[in-house]
């Protein structure tokens, strides 16, 4: 169970537990609801499980940037595209731990370490494990995204103190091969299974704005809602088009469609932390407020998300103050 979920009061809410038997048609039907009805339903679900005035604040650090052999069409870190991004070596553990300490001092409660790899190599495991254990010792919730994992690697990361492992599905299965060809959908599902079997929490979501249809978005959420366990953390990214990538000229998704994505995610995965990930830099405070109303309860803080910009700390502090929201208490 997500440690941040608050107890349910059976006198006030439907005691039914989250479902794992959603059909694609049911998820599509949620997307088709009138906007205000959908947001109202999502807000009701949100209040069953969480304090709607609280936000979890996460910070993300790229511990190894660029040079990835994959061809994910949205990503600046692929070596297959000319994006002008210089590849870097894996950071030293001490550097990462110092960055995590700074993040905690700035208000972050969760620290995620990302490496631009297709898969984790055993030779890198000791250094990654040192990063994780050092960040964990600071009292932060730990997350990593390092590509595909074997069962033994997942167990080693768990032993090092990793709380969450991020491995996104990106989009629905019917649209996936239009975005990525170097890794199959099943590859991603297999890594998620290894993470679950190792006893770690899963962080898994996707991206909107890649040219997909509403049915494709429903397909992604249907996949997540029918996993053996819902993702403990569910990030939704609004594509930040990167010049030089195949999706560099993508048109922005309608803002209300992004809110619909948040709302449906909250309804079908009611106990997940639903995170607004990439894309907040170009969102108005009104749009973000709608997302929080629709069930988003986590954001990334810090001026950089891997290779894209994110709102400055002062902007986020002003946003929370304007909305009278507060950072989520540490579990």
Swiss-Prot record:
UniProt-annotated binding residues for [4Fe-4S] cluster: 68, 72, 75
UniProt cross-references to Pfam families, sorted A to Z: BATS, Radical_SAM
A biological process term (GO) from this entry: biotin biosynthetic process
Main enzyme class: transferase
Domain Radical SAM core: 53-271
Cofactor: how bound: Binds 1 [4Fe-4S] cluster. The cluster is coordinated with 3 cysteines and an exchangeable S-adenosyl-L-methionine.
Taxonomy, superkingdom: Bacteria
Binding sites annotated in the UniProt record for [2Fe-2S] cluster: 112, 143, 203, 275
InterPro entries recorded: Aldolase_TIM, BATS_dom, Biotin_synth/BioAB, Biotin_synthase, Elp3/MiaA/NifB-like_rSAM, rSAM
Stored SUPFAM superfamilies: Radical SAM enzymes
Keyword set includes Iron-sulfur: yes
Cofactor(s), names only, from the UniProt record: [4Fe-4S] cluster; [2Fe-2S] cluster
Keywords for the protein's UniProt record, in alphabetical order: 2Fe-2S, 4Fe-4S, Biotin biosynthesis, Iron, Iron-sulfur, Metal-binding, S-adenosyl-L-methionine, Transferase
CDD domains listed in its UniProt record: Radical_SAM
UniProt cross-references to Gene3D superfamilies, sorted A to Z: Aldolase class I
Similarity annotation: Belongs to the radical SAM superfamily. Biotin synthase family.
Subunit structure: Homodimer.
NCBIfam families associated with the record: bioB
The protein, known as: Biotin synthase
Organism this protein belongs to: Phenylobacterium zucineum (strain HLK1)
Gene: bioB
């Amino acid at each position: 169970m997500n440690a941040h979920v608050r107890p349910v009061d059976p006198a006030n809410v439907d005691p039914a537990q989250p479902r794992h038997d959603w059909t694609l048609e049911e998820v599509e039907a949620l997307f088709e609801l009138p906007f205000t009805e959908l947001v109202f339903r999502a807000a009701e679900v949100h209040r069953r499980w969480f304090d709607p005035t609280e936000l979890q604040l996460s910070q993300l650090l790229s511990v190894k940037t660029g040079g990835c052999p994959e061809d994910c069409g949205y990503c600046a870190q692929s070596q297959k595209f000319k994006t002008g991004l210089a590849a870097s070596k894996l950071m030293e553990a001490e550097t990462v731990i110092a960055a995590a300490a700074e993040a905690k001092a700035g208000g972050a409660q969760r620290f995620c370490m990302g490496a631009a790899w297709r898969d984790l190599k055993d030779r890198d495991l000791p250094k990654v494990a040192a990063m994780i254990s050092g960040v964990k010792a600071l009292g932060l919730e730990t997350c990593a995204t390092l590509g595909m994992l074997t069962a033994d690697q997942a167990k080693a990361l768990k032993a090092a103190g990793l709380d969450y492992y991020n491995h996104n599905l990106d989009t629905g299965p019917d649209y996936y091969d239009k975005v990525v060809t170097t890794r199959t959908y099943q590859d991603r599902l297999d890594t998620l299974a290894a993470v679950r079997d190792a006893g770690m929490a899963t962080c898994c979501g996707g991206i909107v704005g890649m040219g997909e249809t509403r049915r494709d978005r429903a397909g992604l959420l249907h996949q997540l809602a029918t996993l053996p366990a819902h993702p403990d953390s569910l990030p939704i990214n609004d594509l930040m088009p990167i010049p030089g990538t195949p999706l560099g000229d993508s048109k922005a998704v309608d803002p209300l469609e992004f809110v619909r994505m948040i709302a449906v995610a909250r309804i079908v995965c009611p106990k997940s932390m639903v995170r607004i990930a990439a894309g907040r830099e170009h969102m108005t405070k009104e749009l973000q407020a709608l997302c929080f109303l629709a069930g988003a309860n986590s954001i990334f803080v810090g001026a950089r998300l891997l290779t894209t910009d994110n709102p400055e700390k002062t902007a986020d502090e002003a946003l929370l103050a304007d909305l009278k929201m507060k950072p989520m208490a540490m579990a």
